[in-house]
Amino acid sequence: MGVPKKRTSSMRRDRRRAANFKLKPVNVVKCPKCKEPVLPHRACPSCGTYKGEQITEAS
């Protein structure tokens, strides 16, 4: 049975675990009305529309 000969240091252990942590790029879509970039499933901050309806006042 495989047993480690030496103890793995915390730095080596943490570096190995951190290799799997990758940030994903933010998904951005264009607003159909004003063509500004907007996060999906959120009202457009520039024109205030969501799913073709006016939700908030335009800023």
UniProtKB/Swiss-Prot annotation:
GO molecular function: structural constituent of ribosome
InterPro entries: Ribosomal_bL32, Ribosomal_bL32_bact, Ribosomal_zn-bd
Tagged with keyword Ribonucleoprotein: yes
GO BP of this protein: translation
Domain of life: Bacteria
A Gene Ontology cellular-component term: large ribosomal subunit
Record keywords, A-Z: Ribonucleoprotein, Ribosomal protein
Recorded family membership: Belongs to the bacterial ribosomal protein bL32 family.
Annotated NCBIfam families: rpmF_bact
PANTHER family attached to this UniProt entry: 50S RIBOSOMAL PROTEIN L32, LARGE RIBOSOMAL SUBUNIT PROTEIN BL32
HAMAP family: Ribosomal_bL32 (MF_00340)
Protein name, UniProt field: Large ribosomal subunit protein bL32
Protein's gene: rpmF
